[in-house]
Amino acid sequence: MNTSQQQQQQQQQQQQQQQQQQQTPQQVENVSAFPPPPPFYKLYLNYKKDVDYSKPTTENSKKNDTPEGNESTIEKNIDNSDEMNIDNNNNNNNNNNNNNNNNNNNNNNNNNNNNNNNNNNNNNNNKATTSTNKKIELNKPLAPPLPPKVGANYVQFGQTYSTVDMLPSLDESGAKQLYPKGDIEPISELKKLNRSILFNYLQLLETLIENPKNYQSKIEDISLLFINFHHLLNSYRPHQARETLLSIMNEQIKQKNQSNESIKKALDICKESLMNSFKNLNIEDKQIDSATPLPTNITSPTKNLMSPTKLNNSQDVNMNENNDDDEDKEINWMDQLLDEMLKIN
């Protein structure tokens, strides 16, 4: 029983110690970046203020009484001082070397950081330029494909086409030609094919009523008729295009003739209105001239005195000459205007 109790007590003590260790914070050693201090600090550890080092102790006095003891102590002190100086110098050199090494390491780290930053910047710039180039390339429209060469074939919507617009014959397409070959009248042949299509359609209705199983042959006949009908229409396309072009040109000629006639009518109306306006202007000028008084010369009344009959005659002559000149000018102006308008037309 005693042994079991002792074991339990020991276990309890161990648990308490573990709990205390967990509760107590772990002591972290102070790690400094500076080098360790020199060993001369050990001199100050044994320093005591109460002790008077000026007075010699009993042991030292006993030793110092003999000349051999004095010499030995002096030599020991000298050796200790030399050793201390050597240690101090070595420590100082080590400290300086450590500082230099630390500075060199710091400079190297700074240079490496700068190089890394420059490399990162260059990489970022390269990425930015590549991204911009990609965006520019995406924004650019796609270049159209090159056109096929003359005589070559190309595929469009799953079908092959030729660059030369040639209508293949029915034999080349694998169908039977029902209308005759050579020079034919396409209109009459189209009418025949249309009638045959209607006749075969009626026969198809009869077969569906009497024998519904035998409808396949009539459907094949109708499909062959439609193929021939479409082929003949396609061969007639150039003639149709020529006729449509002729009709369009005839309509344009009619429209131009109508526009010319309307312009001529407008010119005649303008001529009449201009002539009427000029006539009205001449009448107004004559009325103004008749209302003006006769001129008199005050300086030489004897020389310029004339009979009223002579004055009236001279005024009439002058008026007639002026009117003739005005009419000639009006006629010339009208002729020029008409000539210019005709040139424009």
Curated annotation (Swiss-Prot):
Keywords, comma-separated and alphabetical: Activator, Nucleus, Transcription, Transcription regulation
Span list, region Disordered: 1-130, 292-315
Compositionally biased region (Low complexity): 1-27, 88-126
Compartments (UniProt record): Nucleus
Record function comment: Component of the Mediator complex, a coactivator involved in the regulated transcription of nearly all RNA polymerase II-dependent genes. Mediator functions as a bridge to convey information from gene-specific regulatory proteins to the basal RNA polymerase II transcription machinery. Mediator is recruited to promoters by direct interactions with regulatory proteins and serves as a scaffold for the assembly of a functional preinitiation complex with RNA polymerase II and the general transcription factors.
Protein name (record): Putative mediator of RNA polymerase II transcription subunit 7
Domain of life, per lineage: Eukaryota
Keyword set includes Transcription: yes
